[in-house]
Amino acid sequence: MILVLGGVTALGLCCTSVSFAADAPNGVVLNEACAKNTAFAAADGAYYDWIELYNPTGQAVDLSGYGLTDDPVKPGQYVFPTGTILEAGGRLLVFCDAKAVAPAGQLMAPFGLSKDGETLLLTDPTGKQVDTIAFGAIGENVSYGRVPDGSDQFAYLNMSPDQPNQTEDVLKTAVDAPIFSKKPGFYDAGFDLTLSAPAGTTIYYTLDGSDPTTDSQKYTGPIAISDVSSSQNVLSARTDIAATDFMSQVTAPTSPVDKGMILRAIAVDANGASSSVAVGAYFIGYQNRASFYRDCKVISLVTDSANLFDYEKGIYVLGKTYDDWRNGPDYDYSTRTWEMPANYMQSGALWERPASMQIFENGSLVLSQDVGIRIHGGATRSQNQKSFNVYARSNYGAAKVEYDLFSGKVQSQFNGGVIDSFDSFMLRNAGNDSQYTRFRDKLNQSLVSDRDLLTQGMEPCIVFVDGEFWGHYEITEKLSDSLVKDHYGIKKKDVCIIKNEELDEGTEEGFVEFTALYEWVKTADLSDDANYKKLCAQVDIQSFMDYMSAEFYYNNTDWGQNNMAMWKSMQVKENNPYADGKWRFILFDTEYSTNLYGQTKPSDNSFAGLLKQDCFLSKLFSAALQNDTFRRDFCLTFMDMANENFKPERVTARIEALSRQYQDMTLATYNRFWPGWPGGQYAQSQYNSETQQVRSFYQSRFDSITSALAGTLSLQGRLVSLTVRNDESCGTIQVNSLTPDLSGGDWIGKYYTDVPVTLTAAPKAGYQFAYWNIGDQQKLTDASCQLELTGDVTVQAVYTQSLLGDVDLDGDVDVADLVQLQRYLLRQGTLTPEQAVQADLTGDQRLDAADLMRLRRMLMQ
C-alpha cells in the first residue's frame, strides 16, 4: 500500500508540515523516523538514528521475517528476528547504524538514515511491500511521522520516540520553495533567471537534474538561462541501456541532441529544514527547429540520473541484474536480448522511481507534477528507447493527473464525458513498430474505436529526460481498473481484468470465474442452443465478435495467448448496462501486424493462425463456431467491419494523415536511438517504404481475409454488393451492427449470400418511414427487416412527411385515428413507436387524455 507523504515531492523533500490525505492504513505501519538524533539515547548511551513501527490494528502482529530497508533495491537489509511480536496498539523502535552492535534488548538495523532524506520500506516475509514512507531533509531532533499515530496524515515533528505523535508536536513552520522569476517553458532567447525565497533561508540548486542538497551549488545571483543543445551529451551518450547481439546494437548519437536547461532548487532554513524542490525546464531557441515541438505536447521528466542509470538501482540500464546473470549458472549464450535478465526487465513497486513531470503545449507550461515512473512493456523493454509508466500518487503530491492528456478526444462510453483525470498513463515507445512507422497501433485501434470493445486513447508527444531529447512517445491510456472505471462507470473495486490468461486486476473470485469459463468451453457443445445461451450470459458476444474481427483483420501474430485482455464487473448494477457481469474485451499492443517486418502479410489466414494456438481465445472461438447463430452473427459483424471500419479509402486517408504527422518525429527518434545502424542515417525513403507497407496491407487485405472467413465458417455462397441509399435529412439507417457513412453518397458493402442482412430505418421528427425500395423490384414496409441477398442489389429507405394525428399511418387524420388512440389509452390496443410519435399531439413525449382531447378538437375543426 502506498501511503500519503507530507508534501513529499518526487525527490523526497518536504514543503509542508502536514501531508495530503490517503487511504487509512490497515496493518503495521512505519510511524515515525529520525535521521539526526542527539537527544534520545539508546541503552548503551549512544545516539542513533531510529525508526518507529506502530500497530494500529486490534490484534498482535508477528513480525518474524519481516524486512526493513532504506534502499528499495535491497529489500530486507534488516530482518526482524523470530519471535518479534508487535502488540495491538503497540510501538516498536528500531535503531539504525551501519556499524554499531544492537544494545542489549533493543533492535539495530545495519544502515543509517541520511539527514538529506530517505525512502524506507517495510516488507513481509515473502518480500511483498507492507508500507513505505519517504521524507526530505530533516533538522536535528526533528522526526517525520504520522499525526496521530497510524493515521494517513504526516508531518515534521519534535521527535517523540516510543511515545504518541500528537498535534502539539507538529512543527508549525514550513519552508516555502524557491520562486523562479520566469515560468518554465520555451523561449526564443536566453535570459537571466532570478530565484527568491523567504528571508532567513539559503537556496541551493543543480543544473544536471540531480537532487539538490546543502552540498549543491549555493545561489548567490541570477542564473543565465541559455540554449544548451550544443553541450556534450550525457545521458544520451550511455550505451549500457540494452544488450547486443547479431540483430541489435547500441550506438550513441554522434552529434549533440536537442536539450533544455533543467534547474532544481531548494530553500533551507537555519534549523536545516528544507523546502520542496522547485523544478524548471527551459528550452531556448526552438522557434526555428522541428515543427513537432510546436504541434505536439512536450513532456519533461526530471529525476536524479541514478534513478535511471545507477548500476544497482537504475531502471533504464542492464545493471547488476544483467551481470549477475552473465556470471551465474543460468547464463546461456543463445538467449535473445529480450529474454536476458537486466535491471530494465524488473517490475513492481520496488522498481518505481520518483520524477518531476512538466507538460508544455505551444511552448507554455500547462502542468507541473511529481510522479512515479517505471519501465513498461514486455520484450520491448530491451530496446534502446524504453516505454514508461507514469503514476500519480498521494505520496508524490497529487493522487491524479488532472489534465486532458488527449485533447478532448477520449470520452466515456458510460456518460459521454471527456476523460481528463488519470491515476496513471503510459509513455509508449511504439512497441514492435518503434523502428518503422511508429503509428501502427494507433492506426489500428482508431479504426475500430466506434465498436463494442475498449480501445486506448493515444496522442503523440515529445519527451525530454533530464533535459535531453528522448524522442517521440505515444501518451497512452494504461490498461488498468482505472481505465475500465473511466470508460464504463464501474467502481475500481468491482473490476476484474484478465490479461494474457492471468489475473491482472481484481479479486481471486474473478479469476476463478474466468478459469471455470475456460475449462467449460474446452468441452462444451455449443451447437446446443441452451449451451450457447449459457455462453451469452457470461460473455458479451458482440464485444467478442468485434474484438476477434479486428485482430483477425490486422493479422496480429503477437496475439492469442499474448496481448489479450478482457474485463467484467463483479457487481451487477441495473442502472449501468456495462455492469451486467459479462466479459468484454480490450484492444492493446496491436502493432505486430499489417505487414510488420514483412512477416504479417495481407494474404495470411489469421483464422487458421489463431486456431493452431492452445489458448483461451482459440478455444472460445472454436467452440462458438459450432453454433449456427454465432456463425451467422459473426459473418455479418466481420463483413460490417470489413466494409466500413477497414474500407480501403477510409484507411488510406487515415494513413496519409498519420504519415505526415509522424514522419519528422520518427526520423528524429530513430536517429536519436539507432544512429548509423543499419546502414547510416534513417532516411525519408525508408520511412516512406515502411508507410507503404501498411498502406498496401489494407489495400489488399479484403479479398484474402474474406475468403478465409468463408472457409472458416463453411460458407457456400458468394460475395455480392449491397448499395444503400438514404436521405439523411429524413432519417438514419443501420445495416446489421453498423451505421454506414453516407456522407459521400451511396454506401457500398459486400456480403455473402449465405446470410441475410438486417436493415433498420429510424425516421427523424416530422417524417415517417414508408418502405424499403429493393432494386426497384420490391417494397418492404417494415422499418426493420431482413433481406435475402441473391445478387448485387441497391436498397433505398423511403420516407414521407408525417401528419401529426395520423395514428394509423394511413395518410389521413380521421375518426379511425381517434378510435385507435382511445383504445390504446384504455389499454385495449398497442401502438408502434412510429404511431406513438404521431399520437403525441401535445409534444410532451407521453400519451394521455390531453392528446386525445387535442385530436378530437382537430377533427371537430
Predicted regions and their residues:
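Bacterial N-terminal signal peptides
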Residues: 2-14
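Short, compositionally stereotyped local motifs that mark structural "simplifiers"
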Residues: 6-7, 21, 29, 33, ...
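Cellulosome-associated attachment modules in secreted, modular CAZymes
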Residues: 11-12, 16-17, 21, 796-861
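Activation on beta-sandwich/Ig-like modules and their edge loops
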Residues: 20-154, 215
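Second-shell loop/turn segments in exported
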Residues: 40-41, 427-436, 534-535, 620-622, ...
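Short, solvent-exposed loop/turn and secondary-structure capping segments
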Residues: 42-44, 64, 79, 104-107, ...
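Middle-to-C-terminal accessory/interaction subdomains
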Residues: 161-170, 295-322, 326-336, 344-347, ...
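Conserved ATP-binding subdomain of kinase catalytic cores across diverse folds
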Residues: 301, 327-512
